């Protein structure tokens, strides 16, 4: 519960506790173009009216506290307070509501995702009057988004750097993720790149462990990249994970990558933190490095339907903080991701202007005002039989990443890479010829396997592998 706030000194100070809704529930409010808008899924405790719950969220995530304080009279709360301006029940759910909250732009530090999240979600999620709370979406106004650099380079600049157009990019996470020596790790990188992949990748928890220190890994991977480039005539890359225990150490690793002349580094943006990520993104733009982002820890935050933060919000935050790639689920693989929900936040990552579309979970129209886009990365439990669906779902502006689906090939790493490259080229050609990949995809793969023994072997190994579990987070 919270005060009805009077901001004029002549009124005088009246101590006490009053309902939040008397001050922070304002259904007559017309949102401003400069407001940050939030859509919260609110589950109040029994006996708490939805208007009070929505107002409590607005208050506790902006200027309010649990009781009237005399310093309220020293400022204009009408200028600075958050406002719950609309509440609607969630269809099919009992005692659950979407509360829309508007925040004045002056509440937030320019160019700081850290400050934005500290304000909007930093404290209110532990509020006792709420059984559960989930931040479903944010509208970031151009007046705020223009204070951010955003991705270091973006989709078009990356394609120009790599000289690769008209198809998704292909990647592979090196497995086993832990335990290889740096030299054996570099060998696997070389074999995959030589076989036809565009990128290989450090897994999210590959940092600098006793069995493989980061500098040794960087050196052997750089050697692998240059050797594969010389043999194939294509530009290659390996996502060198710069994530570290301190921001200073992270930057030291990024500097080493730049000195080695490699094209791309990597960061775990949630475990590493938004402040560190934004610093790294600025360095990458200034020094010509692409930045791959892994979302390790995201499911702790976003998987539960009633509590937490939806990934579309984390995706928007990443676009502002900075990254050229980010993992975005696969729809068809082993990791969580319902199709319409996934395509909704994929558009929020890639496009300049995204219309409100509740059928895909997009609560607000978002205008990025020419901020560079981010390539979504499909990774996790995918193999050659998934290639038609992945090509059809994600389109050209994506990275399709096969870890076990490359390194698990019965003939070795390079043949695994060949199989994936052949499958991708076949799917792109079939699509360009007007064939329906959703309906004819398996036939396209079978036809291509007649001319590629590597693809035929991969098709045989993974013909029975499926991950058919219902998504937890559905619209």
Curated annotation (Swiss-Prot):
Mg(2+) binds at residues 201, 203-204. It catalyses: 2 (2R)-3-phosphoglycerate + 2 H(+) = D-ribulose 1,5-bisphosphate + CO2 + H2O; D-ribulose 1,5-bisphosphate + O2 = 2-phosphoglycolate + (2R)-3-phosphoglycerate + 2 H(+). The keyword Phosphoprotein does not apply. Its EC number is 4.1.1.39. The active site is at 175 (proton acceptor), 294 (proton acceptor). Substrate binds at residues 123, 173, 177, 295, 327, 379. One of its GO terms (biological process) is reductive pentose-phosphate cycle. This is Ribulose bisphosphate carboxylase large chain. RuBisCO catalyzes two reactions: the carboxylation of D-ribulose 1,5-bisphosphate, the primary event in carbon dioxide fixation, as well as the oxidative fragmentation of the pentose substrate in the photorespiration process. Both reactions occur simultaneously and in competition at the same active site. Binds 1 Mg(2+) ion per subunit. The gene is rbcL. Keywords: Acetylation, Calvin cycle, Carbon dioxide fixation, Chloroplast, Lyase, Magnesium, Metal-binding, Methylation, Monooxygenase, Oxidoreductase, Photorespiration, Photosynthesis, Plastid. Its main location: plastid. HAMAP family: RuBisCO_L_type1. It comes from Nymphaea alba.
């Amino acid at each position: 519960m919270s005060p009805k706030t009077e901001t004029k000194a002549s009124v005088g100070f009246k101590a006490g506790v009053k309902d939040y809704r008397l001050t922070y529930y304002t259904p007559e409010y017309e949102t401003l173009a400069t407001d940050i808008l939030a859509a919260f899924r609110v589950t109040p405790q029994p006996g708490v009216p939805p208007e009070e719950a929505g107002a409590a969220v607005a208050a506790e995530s902006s200027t309010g506290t649990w009781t009237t304080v005399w310093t309220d009279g020293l400022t204009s709360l009408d200028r600075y307070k958050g406002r719950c301006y609309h509440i609607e029940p969630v269809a099919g759910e009992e005692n659950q509501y979407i509360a829309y909250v508007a925040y004045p732009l002056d509440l937030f530090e320019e160019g700081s995702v850290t400050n934005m999240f500290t304000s909007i979600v930093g404290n209110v999620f532990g509020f006792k009057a709420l059984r559960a709370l989930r931040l479903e979406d944010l509208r970031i106004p151009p007046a705020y988004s223009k204070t951010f650099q955003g991705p270091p380079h973006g989709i078009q600049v990356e394609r120009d750097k790599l000289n690769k157009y008209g198809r998704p990019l292909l990647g592979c996470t090196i497995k086993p993720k832990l335990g290889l020596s740096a030299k054996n790790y570099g060998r696997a990188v070389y074999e995959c790149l030589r076989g036809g992949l565009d990128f290989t990748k450090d897994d999210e928890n590959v940092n600098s462990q006793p069995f493989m220190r980061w500098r040794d890994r960087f050196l052997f991977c750089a050697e692998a990249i240059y050797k594969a480039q010389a043999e194939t005539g294509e530009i290659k890359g390996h996502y060198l994970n710069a994530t570290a225990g301190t921001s200073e150490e992270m930057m030291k690793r990024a500097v080493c990558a730049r000195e080695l002349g490699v094209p791309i580094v990597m960061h775990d943006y949630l475990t590493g933190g938004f402040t560190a990520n934004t610093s790294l993104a600025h360095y990458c733009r200034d020094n010509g490095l692409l930045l791959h982002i892994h979302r390790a820890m995201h499911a702790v935050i976003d998987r539960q339907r009633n509590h937490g933060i939806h990934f579309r919000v984390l995706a928007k935050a990443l676009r502002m903080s900075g990254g050229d790639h980010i993992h975005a689920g696969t729809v068809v693989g082993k990791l969580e991701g319902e199709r319409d929900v996934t395509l909704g936040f994929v558009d929020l990552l890639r496009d300049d202007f995204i219309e409100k579309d509740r059928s895909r979970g997009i609560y607000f129209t978002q205008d990025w005002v020419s901020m560079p886009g981010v390539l979504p990365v499909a990774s996790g439990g995918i193999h050659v039989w998934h290639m038609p669906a992945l090509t059809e779902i994600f389109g050209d502006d994506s990275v399709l990443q096969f870890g076990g689906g490359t390194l698990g090939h019965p003939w070795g790493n390079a043949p695994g890479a060949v199989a994936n490259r052949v499958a991708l080229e076949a799917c792109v050609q079939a699509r360009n010829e007007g064939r329906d990949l959703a309906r004819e995809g398996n036939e396209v793969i079978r036809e291509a396997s007649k001319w590629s023994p590597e693809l035929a072997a991969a098709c045989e190994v993974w013909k029975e592998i499926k991950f058919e579990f219902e998504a937890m987070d559905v619209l």
